[in-house]
């Protein structure tokens, strides 16, 4: 190499300097030249020690340290520069401005030239006998080995006089004592930098170095060496005191840490670094790595994914990982089938942004996880339908990959676990669902023309984005309340009533306005805790059943009635308060039967009696009774109005039926006449054919008759002639 030594550290102080060394006053000692051109013990024995000086006596302290059970190699790569001639002691020209420059990554090799001269002393034992490989305890601590320190100083090195400092590293006449591996000649140890942590990793992180130098947390350097072959010796100078603490290695293994030469210290393997590797590296390679991880480290990875998804500060990092996954084209069904279980859960959780996959709850089969990652199965663990649902080919299912029409909102493309609620609204035709809040924001719930009433009337409808079909909202809300309202608590009931109020806020029809007013009324009373949730539920159900409940008059009168009833029940706690049920309405609207229910016109067998309820009431309750009577009169007027509307609707339906019947009869007669005409034409054609056949046969008969008559006439004439001749 380019470096040389003046013998200030290697030679004996009493020995004269070598005559073969040219005087290079400014030469520097590089680590690669120091380690590659140092004579070996084996070659010294073969070469007879030519060109080498006497060695230093062995160091007893170092020998004692070599017998230690830790088998540590003490070296210091920070003090290997030979002092320049002419420089005062302690002068370090590499320190500029109080800062030490950072060195480039250098790949070091301790392979020695087999034909180089060496003359080690016979008293120095071979270093190969002192190096004992230590088995790896973790995937990150790969082959970290410790060796005993070398007690004796090495012999002085000889140099070729033909080697100049201006010689290029790639020149043809370069000495073959250099390592066959990659070296960075610009990395001189005379810089004395404390940042040469990647010295043993090679240029650009090469993995081909013979020795892996992995720094410890205290700045020292440890060697990881493969087992030495027979006949191969290795040399380490005594000027490299360093030690690898066994306690640090044990702490690294117990804490899940790793030696990272590129970062310069022992540190715990960060879960986010492993997550980035899982996202970017090969599936098979990471599956093998995760296979050796203990369950505690796998749980740490799951916890890191959950924290990344739930934390608002790490949304950018999550989005970055998702973009990396989207750019990968090698993630197929076959590739993901070879993935580790935890690896697959992490990939699905990162891609979908759902932390449920890494919580350990609701374990999903690996095949379904692969389908969820490839967006061929719904990612909702409560649904897990095969996509597209029912082979739907609407504009949403065909364009939005991974969209599930059975549980995902068609507007925001999100899902939740809500069920039996008015917060979701569905289409009657295609079955797509949507959040009510999203539909209201996009104005998908709006008044539309109705088919039930007269022409020009409207009702509140939901416009589906998938099929553009309009579904009426009153019947949907009515069905939800009839099926699910009894199981709701007070909080849920108030939330549902608030959504009902928002849905029918801009309604113009009679039913929608009444439901909006009823929802506001009951919601206000529930907020003031004037009525119980059970009474509120019964009031809403009575509204859906009869159109108007006991106290369903909008405005201040209705609120006053409910408040009066509440105060009355408070004053009469000792008395049993029977439930006052209004008589059944005269008209029962049913979709499966006729519009008018004639049985409802019959008088009720048990007339409503409210006298026992008010017989023991005080005079203060008379006003409440009068208010109730007025309320009943108002209800009677409303019922009469409903009856009139029903009669008008019946008349319109009858007129429609008549016109449709007449039109159908005309169409039927026309089709029947057309069919009969075709049949008649066919019969006429057949008759004409028969007539023609008869005419032809008759003509043949006449010709035969005429021919026979002619023949008979001729015979008669001949007979008369013959008779005359005989006479």
Curated annotation (Swiss-Prot):
Recorded coiled-coil stretches: 629-697
Tissue specificity annotation: Widely expressed.
Signal peptide, first to last residue: none
Alphabetical GO biological process terms: cell fate specification; embryonic pattern specification; inorganic cation import across plasma membrane; maintenance of root meristem identity; maintenance of shoot apical meristem identity; regulation of gene expression; root meristem specification
InterPro entries cross-referenced by the UniProt entry: OBE1-like_PHD, OBERON, Oberon-like_PHD, Oberon_cc
Pfam families from the UniProt entry: Oberon_cc, PHD_Oberon
Gene Ontology CC terms: nucleus
Segments of skewed composition (Basic and acidic residues): 67-88
Keywords linked to the UniProt accession: Coiled coil, Growth regulation, Metal-binding, Nucleus, Transcription, Transcription regulation, Zinc, Zinc-finger
Keyword Transcription: yes
KW Transcription (keyword) present: yes
Region entry Disordered, spans: 1-136
Residue ranges, compositional bias (Pro residues): 14-25
Biased composition (Low complexity): 104-117
Localization in the cell: Nucleus
GO MF annotation list: zinc ion binding
Positions annotated as zinc finger (PHD-type): 406-470
Described function: Probable transcription factor that functions as a regulator of metal transporter genes responsible for essential metals delivery to shoots and normal plant growth. Required for the maintenance of metal transporter gene expression, such as IRT1, IRT2, ZIP1, ZIP9, NRAMP1 and NRAMP5.
Protein's name in the database: Protein TITANIA
């Amino acid at each position: 190499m380019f470096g040389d030594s003046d013998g200030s550290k290697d030679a004996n102080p009493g020995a004269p300097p070598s005559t073969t060394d040219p005087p290079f006053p400014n030469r520097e000692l590089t680590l690669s030249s120091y380690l590659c051109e140092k004579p070996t013990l084996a070659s010294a024995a073969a070469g007879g020690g030519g060109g080498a000086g006497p060695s230093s006596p062995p160091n007893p302290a170092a020998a004692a340290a070599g017998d230690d059970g830790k088998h540590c190699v003490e070296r210091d790569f920070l003090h290997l520069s030979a002092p320049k001639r002419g420089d005062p002691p302690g002068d370090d020209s590499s320190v500029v401005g109080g800062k030490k420059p950072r060195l480039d990554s250098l790949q070091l090799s301790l392979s020695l030239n087999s034909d180089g001269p060496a003359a080690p002393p016979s008293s120095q034992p071979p270093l190969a006998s002192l190096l004992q490989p230590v088995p790896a305890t973790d995937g990150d601590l790969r082959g970290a080995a410790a060796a005993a320190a070398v007690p004796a100083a090495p012999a002085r090195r000889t140099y070729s006089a033909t080697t100049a400092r201006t010689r290029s590293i790639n020149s043809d006449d370069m000495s073959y004592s250099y390592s066959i591996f990659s070296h960075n000649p610009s990395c001189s140890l005379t810089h004395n930098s404390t940042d040469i942590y990647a010295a043993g990793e090679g240029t650009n992180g090469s993995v081909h170095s013979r020795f892996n130098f992995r720094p410890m947390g205290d700045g020292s350097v440890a060697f990881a060496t493969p087992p030495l072959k027979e006949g191969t010796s290795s040399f380490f100078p005594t000027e490299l005191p360093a030690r690898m603490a066994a306690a640090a290695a044990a702490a690294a293994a117990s804490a899940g840490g790793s030696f990272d030469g590129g970062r310069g210290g022992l540190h715990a393997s960060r879960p986010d670094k492993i997550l980035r590797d899982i996202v970017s590296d090969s599936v098979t390679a990471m599956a093998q790595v995760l296979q050796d991880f203990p369950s505690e480290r796998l749980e740490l990875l799951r916890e890191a994914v959950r924290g990344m998804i739930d934390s608002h500060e790490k949304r950018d990092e999550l989005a970055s990982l998702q973009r990396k996954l989207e750019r990968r084209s090698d993630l197929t069904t076959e590739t993901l089938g070879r993935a580790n279980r935890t690896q697959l859960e992490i990939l699905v959780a990162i891609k979908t942004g759902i932390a449920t996959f890494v919580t350990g709850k609701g374990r999903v089969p690996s095949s379904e996880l692969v389908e969820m990652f490839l967006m061929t199965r719904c990612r909702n663990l409560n649904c897990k339908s095969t996509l597209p649902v029912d082979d739907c080919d609407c504009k949403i299912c065909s364009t939005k990959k991974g969209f599930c029409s059975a549980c995902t909102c068609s507007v925001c493309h999100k899902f939740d676990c809500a069920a039996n609620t008015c917060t979701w609204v569905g289409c009657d035709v295609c079955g797509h669902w949507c959040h009510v809040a999203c539909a209201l924001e996009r104005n998908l719930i709006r008044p539309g023309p109705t088919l039930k009433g007269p022409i020009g009337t409207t009702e509140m409808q939901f416009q589906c984005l998938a099929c553009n079909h309009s579904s009426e909202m009153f019947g949907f809300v009515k069905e939800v309340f009839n099926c699910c309202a009894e199981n709701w608590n007070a909080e849920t009931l108030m939330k549902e009533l608030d959504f009902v109020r928002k849905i029918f806020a801009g309604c113009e029809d009679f039913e929608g306005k009444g439901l909006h007013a009823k929802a506001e009324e009951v919601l206000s009373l529930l907020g003031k805790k004037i009525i119980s949730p059970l009474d509120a539920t019964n009031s809403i159900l009575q509204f859906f059943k009869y159109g108007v409940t006991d106290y369903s008059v909008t405005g201040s009168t209705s609120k006053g009635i409910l408040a009066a009833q509440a105060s009355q029940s408070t004053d009469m706690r000792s008395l049993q308060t029977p439930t006052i049920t209004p008589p059944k309405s005269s008209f029962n609207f049913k979709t499966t039967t006729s519009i008018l229910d004639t049985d409802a016109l019959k008088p009720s067998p048990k007339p409503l009696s409210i006298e026992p309820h008010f017989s023991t009431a005080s005079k203060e309750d008379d006003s409440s009774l009068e208010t109730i009577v007025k309320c009943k009169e108002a209800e009677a007027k409303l019922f009469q109005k409903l009856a009139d509307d029903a009669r008008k609707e019946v008349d319109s339906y009858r007129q429609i039926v008549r016109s449709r019947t007449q039109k159908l009869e005309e169409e039927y007669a026309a089709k029947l006449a057309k069919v009969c005409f075709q049949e008649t034409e066919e019969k006429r054609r057949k008759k004409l054919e028969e007539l023609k056949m008869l005419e032809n046969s008759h003509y043949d008969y006449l010709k035969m008759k005429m021919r026979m008559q002619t023949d008979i006439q001729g015979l008669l004439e001949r007979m008369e002639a013959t008779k005359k001749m005989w006479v």
